[in-house]
UniProtKB/Swiss-Prot annotation:
Coiled-coil regions, chain positions: none
Pathway where it operates: Carbohydrate biosynthesis; gluconeogenesis; Carbohydrate degradation; glycolysis; D-glyceraldehyde 3-phosphate from glycerone phosphate: step 1/1
Enzyme category, top tier: isomerase
Positions of the catalytic residues: 99 (electrophile), 169 (proton acceptor)
Catalyses which reaction(s): D-glyceraldehyde 3-phosphate = dihydroxyacetone phosphate
One of the GO biological process terms: glyceraldehyde-3-phosphate biosynthetic process
Protein name, UniProt field: Triosephosphate isomerase
Taxonomic lineage from the root: Bacteria, Pseudomonadati, Pseudomonadota, Alphaproteobacteria, Hyphomicrobiales
Amino acid sequence: MTPGIRPLVAGNWKMNGTSASLNELRMIGNGFMSGLDAETEALVCVPATLLSHAAEILSRTPVHAGGEDCHTKESGAYTGCISAEMLKDAGASHVIVGHSECREQRGEDDATVQAKAAAAWRAGLVAIICIGETQQQREAGATLEVLSRQVAGSVPPSATPSNTVIAYEPVWAIGTGLTPTAADVAEAHAHIRERLSEKLGASAAKTRILYGGSVKPSNAVELLGVRNVDGALVGGASLKAADFLGIAEAYRSISG
């Protein structure tokens, strides 16, 4: 945790969920109404097909609804794409950009990620900018170099704590069950904070840096208690209310 920063626990449902899954979302919202919102801010990013339903369900709770990706353009002949304006219209408050799956599967580079973040801001959304190294880069000892390059290229120079969240997601830990050590996470997050300070100045000290990569209730206290870890970007565990709430519950132990 970082003193003075309210943590954020953000779920990413990815390409999962239908209308039948919305009951899990209701349980997440209800769970935060029991006092968890005093410990942490919460967000669930859902597929575009569910976003308007999710926003309506969560509007009566402290939990926000978000989008999983957006296009760089506001509108146009981009079949199958979703603009930030569309997400905002459907009820989103945040959007994930630069997720490793998008970088790898769609060939997104840092410049595209930065353009998506700027598009999110124009629409009035908070951009969650994802960065992280692959297994090959990690084994080559290039983790910090990769993070430096991604902060430089993916984060717009006008980023502020109110419009931007950074999510460090070691690619090799996503959905694999593998988790870096607390020392590894501490080193990566401290490095990201330093690079943000060089780029953004004093505001970097208040910019939230989330950890993402096989976060679950059983390891949440250890990971989320690391200095400069200001919350979590949660994948598979966000699909089940009990798991997502269990991760958020970690902050009761950490803050207590």
